[in-house]
């Protein structure tokens, strides 16, 4: 009886990890489709969001196969999703600025990584520039960072719901 309950609990948590991983795979696939098929160049903030989503998916996938330390992996997915959400919020802020307050466009990221100090390139990634303020695509009036924020919030809710064992256990029944 107890073993069956524990098994149901683990299966439910593994399903949530797999769901989070699936969300992340879809988001990364859409990002690459937009870049290579639609011709949209990712700005520095978009790259940070991609990295956060990829790390979220990687943590969920490792947690799915590891079969232990579920709280640790759900905590990791929460932290990486919060990082992606924070980057998306900053990106949305830049997009909402009036044109006269938008920061100047900086050099290309490849140029920065080749010719500037790594700390300067990293700062540019996190702060963003004028390229990040341009809305190049939207669906239902929501721009790309808006959709990233929505999916990061969903991932955060899924992860946090599994951090409380009583809540997670009641979902598995």
Labelled PLM ranges:
Residues 29-33, 58-61, 160:
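Alpha-helical transmembrane segments of multipass membrane proteins
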Residues 2-53:
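Transmembrane alpha-helical insertion/packing segments
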Residues 47-63, 111-113:
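Iron-sulfur (Fe-S) cluster-binding segments and ferredoxin-like electron-carrier domains
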Residues 10-22, 62-85, 157, 161:
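Interfacial segments of alpha-helical transmembrane regions
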Residues 96-140:
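Extracytosolic (periplasmic/ER-lumenal) interhelical loops and adjacent juxtamembrane/interface segments
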Residues 30-35, 83-98, 114-115:
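C-terminal TM-helix exit segments that contain a strictly Trp-centered aromatic cap at the helix terminus
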Residues 124-173:
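A hydrophobic membrane-anchoring alpha-helix module
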Residues 37, 66, 94, 164-165:
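Helix-loop junctions at the membrane-solvent interface of multi-pass transporters
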């Amino acid at each position: 009886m107890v073993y069956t309950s524990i098994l149901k609990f683990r299966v439910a948590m593994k399903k949530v990890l797999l769901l989070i991983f699936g969300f992340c795979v879809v988001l990364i696939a859409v990002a690459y489709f937009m870049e290579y098929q639609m011709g949209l160049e990712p700005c520095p903030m978009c790259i940070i969001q991609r990295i956060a989503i990829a790390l979220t998916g990687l943590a969920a996938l490792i947690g799915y196969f590891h079969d232990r330390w579920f709280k640790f992996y759900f905590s990791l997915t929460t932290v990486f999703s919060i990082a992606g959400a924070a980057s998306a919020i900053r990106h949305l802020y830049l997009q909402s600025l009036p044109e006269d307050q938008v920061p100047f466009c900086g050099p290309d990221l490849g140029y920065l990584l080749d010719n500037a100090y790594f700390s300067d390139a990293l700062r540019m990634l996190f702060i963003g520039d004028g390229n990040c303020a341009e809305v190049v695509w939207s669906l239902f009036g929501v721009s790309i960072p808006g959709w990233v924020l929505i999916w990061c919030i969903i991932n955060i809710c899924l992860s946090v719901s599994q951090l409380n064992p009583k809540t997670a256990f009641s979902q598995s029944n």
